[in-house]
Swiss-Prot record:
Species assigned in the record: Pelodictyon phaeoclathratiforme (strain DSM 5477 / BU-1)
Protein name: 1-deoxy-D-xylulose 5-phosphate reductoisomerase
NCBIfam families: Dxr, PRK12464.1
Functional summary from the UniProt entry: Catalyzes the NADPH-dependent rearrangement and reduction of 1-deoxy-D-xylulose-5-phosphate (DXP) to 2-C-methyl-D-erythritol 4-phosphate (MEP).
Pathway(s) it belongs to: Isoprenoid biosynthesis; isopentenyl diphosphate biosynthesis via DXP pathway; isopentenyl diphosphate from 1-deoxy-D-xylulose 5-phosphate: step 1/6
């Protein structure tokens, strides 16, 4: 039986993970849960899964949780340090890293240092500090298993093949809700329109990132670190049906792809069960019913966030950390209706242009770039 700690248990990935766990009580047990926004839902999760320890956002949330709990009272931590304690606790075999944004970096690093295998949904961990995290994974001999559907697809399509036989990897993108929207119309996009993704049900931040195509940009950087692939060997193709989750092209011209219904429970179940497979509960594909699969080139003029991500990856140093931090601030401002849709990428670009990059070594040097970019982005927004 595999003992799990879930960071971000009340979010979209956390809920899907618990649904997979619920289907396989003989395979998985919950040792720890961490969340930041929904204490009431966490209380219900604690009553069902009986974890030994949990973490909440702050001290006030600790008090609120204590009043909601019944007879089962786990050890309660709070803050990022609390999430790190959950992730590195004795008895945990695997950590599902699903905290949104750069906030997931510290707990994930703590888990790796404690020798825990990682099911990674928090792509920002590799975007912000890819080299540091990759080095730690090797040093502590842990598995870093992708939960993102695209990276899970690449991981599965690479299985059994030699790295030197890979020509390139191809990430698919749905194109988001504005795939056919003109550049002029994008300036007037509303928050409500941006939150309506055509294929996936996700949290607000990643839904906006999908609409700007920044999510695909972050996934390009994540793929670079997960698969040791240079930017020149990472392609993106728009695939509106979201049935092919990604592909690997080999030097002989053959392409291997992974297909499935657009449901995060499939890549989650694969990461939790690897190297085996488990029933995920998703709808099985009916290819005749789907009928047609289509593909398009991404438009980096209308969606400059994707271009900025490729530029950050190629430039290296602290640019990816700055890209991510500025984007988090800009998306939050858009969600608060303080800036327009096209201002998101514009804010990121201005912040990157203002940055004097350096070569980070220690974790705090990565976090320093993150903090700088957040403050600079706020100034541009103000």
């Amino acid at each position: 039986m595999r003992s799990l700690a879930i960071l971000g248990s009340t979010g979209s990935i956390g809920l899907s993970t618990l649904d997979v766990v619920r289907q396989h009580p003989e395979k998985f047990k919950i040792a720890g849960l961490a969340e930041g926004h929904d204490v009431a839902l966490l209380a219900e999760q604690i009553k069902e899964f009986l974890p030994a320890a949990v973490s909440v956002r702050d001290a006030d949330s600790v008090k609120k949780l204590q009043t909601l709990l019944g007879s089962h009272k786990p050890e309660i931590f709070h803050g990022l340090e609390g999430a790190a304690a959950i992730a590195s606790a004795e008895g945990v075999d695997m950590v599902v890293s699903a905290i949104v944004g750069a906030a997931g970096l510290l707990p994930t690093v703590s888990a790796i240092k404690a020798g825990k295998h990682i099911a990674l949904a928090n792509k920002e961990t590799l975007v912000v500090a890819g080299k540091l995290v990759s080095d730690l994974v090797k040093k502590h001999n842990v598995h870093l298993l992708p939960v993102d559907s695209e990276h899970s697809a690449i991981f599965q399509s690479l299985a059994g093949h030699r790295a030197e036989d890979v020509e390139r990897i191809i990430l698919t993108a749905s194109g988001g809700p504005f795939r056919n929207t003109s550049a002029e119309e994008l300036k007037n996009v509303t928050l409500e329109q941006a939150l309506k993704h055509p294929q996936w049900t996700m949290g607000a931040k990643i839904t906006i990132d999908s609409a700007t195509m920044m999510n695909k940009g972050l996934e390009v950087i994540e793929a670079h670190w997960l698969f040791s692939m240079p930017a020149e060997k990472i392609g993106v193709v728009v695939h509106p049906q979201s049935i092919i989750h990604s592909m690997v092209e080999y030097i002989d011209g053959c392409v291997i792809a992974q297909l499935g219904s657009p449901d995060m429970r499939a890549p989650i179940a694969y990461a939790l069960s690897w190297p085996e497979r488990s029933e995920s509960g998703i709808h099985k594909l009916d290819l005749p019913k789907i009928g047609t699969l289509t593909f398009e080139e991404p438009d980096m003029e209308r969606f400059p966030a994707l271009r900025l991500a490729f530029e950050a990856l190629k430039a290296g140093l602290t640019y990816p950390a700055v890209l991510n931090a500025a984007n988090e601030i800009a998306v939050a401002a858009f969600l608060d209706r303080k800036i327009g849709f096209t201002d998101i990428a514009a804010t990121v670009e201005k912040t990157m242009q203002a940055h004097e990059a350096y070569d980070p070594i220690e974790l705090d040097e990565y976090l320093q770039a993150d903090r700088w970019a957040r403050e600079m982005a706020k100034k541009f927004i103000a």
